[in-house]
Amino acid sequence: MRFAAEPWDYLAADEAIDHEHPVVQQVASELRTGDDVAYARNAFEYVRDRVTHSQDAGDRRVTWRASDVLSEGTGLCYAKAHAFVALLRAGGVQAGLCYQRLRDGDGFVVHGLAAALIDDRWVRLDPRGNKPGIDVRFSADEDALAFRPDPALGEEDYPTVYAAPHPTVLDVLKSHDDCVAMCENGRLPSTLE
């Protein structure tokens, strides 16, 4: 993994990772039990299981700000990663955003996930939500991924952990108001470049 920012930036708030918002703080306080590993597991399972994946659910709402994702209870993979990272940072756990480029029909789509510093080790964690064919379990010891990119298909794991959402991703989310149409019409980013 490469890091796009200074260590303290992985605890900072921004317009999407608004971990100082009362909604994020309330959820974080409800999830805080035990050590950082237990807290990270609780936050992961909360976002994975209690925030629906908009495309899976056919939900038209487009959320991108962590507090909105948590209050609305829905979001695409990117938005769910924003919420997870915000919860981790609210609990004092360094966390950032990661991306993968995956095959999607005849083209590609960028998939969003998170990385966190747990027990002095960075692991990538994907809270996108389970469904048939996808069953991601929390791990503090190794990456917990929904998808394993296949380089033979042109897929890739982007190696960088970002402290803030990639502008390409955030611009797409902020410029649409219908998630179903955005997904069906191929408006999701196909690359970060």
Where do the model's predicted regions map?
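Generic marker of "main functional regions" within proteins
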Residues: G34, H53, A57, R61, ...
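Residue-level signal for well-ordered alpha-helical scaffold segments within enzymatic catalytic domains
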Residues: E45-D49, A86, A90, A116
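His-Asp-centered catalytic microenvironments across diverse enzyme cores
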Residues: R2-P7, A12-H19, C98-E193
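Secondary-structure boundary elements
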Residues: R2-E72
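Active-site neighborhood of thiol-dependent amide/isopeptide-bond enzymes
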Residues: S54-G112
